[in-house]
């Protein structure tokens, strides 16, 4: 019996060992074959799992411009869609789900658990072989991106709408100094070469241009834009002088010389720095001018100017009611321009308007008291609130329709209502900022009106007096030419006999007389000049009264004080 039992035990052990060895061979076969089998199926279907989210989303977003810091583009990269019918590849989809989540769709419960971690340890498939990394120039990258968008039109991201077709928008095509994305050239550079075809447009009085300087150009890393802006400023100054010629032949000859001189000086400035010059500057003579002519983006000068957002001088019988809420930002205008604020005449004799006029008159009296305390903002705000509360008391005492804001009780809600309806919240109703760098008929129309000049430069009121006294009596078409001549004569006088009577912080008088000197004055002294409308002949106490009737608020930095 003992021998039989021992024999049975030996046979049982041999059977178990044989069964274990067969199971091990199956497991090893699965371990070796399954990752390769899975990758083969995935490669055939077209999955690139798991994809790289940052690069994929970046390439799907519609960008019109590429950045040199973006990741390199890939050639022939496109999203491969899986077959729409699940019957085509049932085995592949099942194995793909098993690869992503081992707990889903377990086919063989007897499969050893150690096989699953080995599947997770397999590295993900890399970028398909068709994707070749390229590094083209920036311009070529833009062409690749644009052509790829046109051909494939990848699906947009969630919540992102496809780009709308581009339509003409003056705000997009106007000439302006922008801060943000800067390129290799300014809008309108190089300028078109003057010819009989564009001469009329060049000398059109309504044609506006941008005066370039530190206020609208970057000051670091873009010195080439400053040189382009200086060339455009010099060119426009010369154009203004040439367009005063009565003969078209003389005008054309003049603007041609101005254009050639501006381009020549631009190239001299380009070669004066250790950077790569403009491509046209590498040529000489007529070849250089022909190059600039071909490179001009707008040779016809047909440019839609940017809308000028400025406060126009008001006219008519409109009453500036309700008055704006006094704030620390507008209290200076409240006090300095108080004597310039005028009440419209010939107002309708209605009770409602008379009550508004009475409130404004009372408020101006209170403002005068507050301004004597050193531009006291708290005082002006309290006077504004008390005046409007009294106005509402009179409105509600009459059995008519009161002002809409008076329906609120005395509270911040009432104050907010009045402040929201104020037509001139900054108290600049009669203030207009003009640009004397280019004298136009519209500018002369403002200057010939009854106004006063507010400028930090002492000589500006004298210039405007010369322009108005000698030019406003001429016919309307001749006023602008006369004003430009008076401006140039005044500049010549300031840099000549009167050179020692004023300070020249911009050193304009050290430049050679002519276009360079006039351009310096246009850029530094004549760009922004404030005009005040109304009869201000009796205004005193707001500053220094000049011999021309102009007023200078505070000492002028460009004047020599005795």
Swiss-Prot record:
A GO biological process held by the record: ossification
Sequence repeat intervals: 172-301, 305-427
Listed Gly residues bias regions: 543-552
A GO term from the CC aspect: collagen-containing extracellular matrix
Residues where Phosphoserine is found: 559
Region: 2 X approximate repeats, residue numbers: 172-427
Record's subunit section: Interacts (via C-terminus) with HSPG2 (via C-terminus). Interacts with EFEMP1/FBLN3 and LAMB3. Interacts with MMP9.
PANTHER family on file: EXTRACELLULAR MATRIX PROTEIN 1
Stated name of the protein: Extracellular matrix protein 1
Lineage, top ranks: Eukaryota, Metazoa, Chordata, Craniata, Vertebrata
